[in-house]
Amino acid sequence: MDAIATIVELVREVVEPVIEAPFELVDIEYGKIGSDMILSIFVDKPEGITLNDTADLTEIISPVLDTIKPDPFPEQYFLEITSPGLERPLKTKDAVAGAVGKYIHVGLYQAIDKQKVFEGTLLAFEEDELTMEYMDKTRKKTVQIPYSLVSKARLAVKL
């Protein structure tokens, strides 16, 4: 596991227990933006998060990060508590299951019917298989995608 992945896992271990319902920890990213190191913690709740929510969560999360010993951060960083946005990543099976009926974008490790990217409505997620309806030019088609082939999935905005 590389240093960044280790930091993300350490942060997840201490942050997950302090984020309580109705909030949900969606993702954690740590990396350089410009010359600054940024620790981004993506949090959501059913009706969406507000600026006050992010301020409250910062007050809860920041002190917890200071308890990690030894300090895993090699340099000073900025803490960012934020919403995952409209195109929220679907990084777990539970997240995919919660997206049934929604419009999603799926990237694959290996092509199905000569396609490695599908965008459409997730009709079902059962027994480790996604069933999606998508448009192929002017025709609606359905595709079965084994979860093991999914490299990346996120909610998508239908234009």
Swiss-Prot record:
GO biological process annotation, one example: translation
Location within or outside the cell: Cytoplasm
A Pfam short name: DUF150_C
Keyword NAD: no
SUPFAM superfamilies in alphabetical order: YhbC-like, C-terminal domain, YhbC-like, N-terminal domain
Origin: domain of life: Bacteria
Keyword annotations of the record: Cytoplasm, Ribosome biogenesis
A single Gene Ontology CC term: cytosol
Record-stated family: Belongs to the RimP family.
Function noted in UniProt: Required for maturation of 30S ribosomal subunits.
Protein name, per record: Ribosome maturation factor RimP
Protein's organism: Streptococcus pneumoniae serotype 4 (strain ATCC BAA-334 / TIGR4)
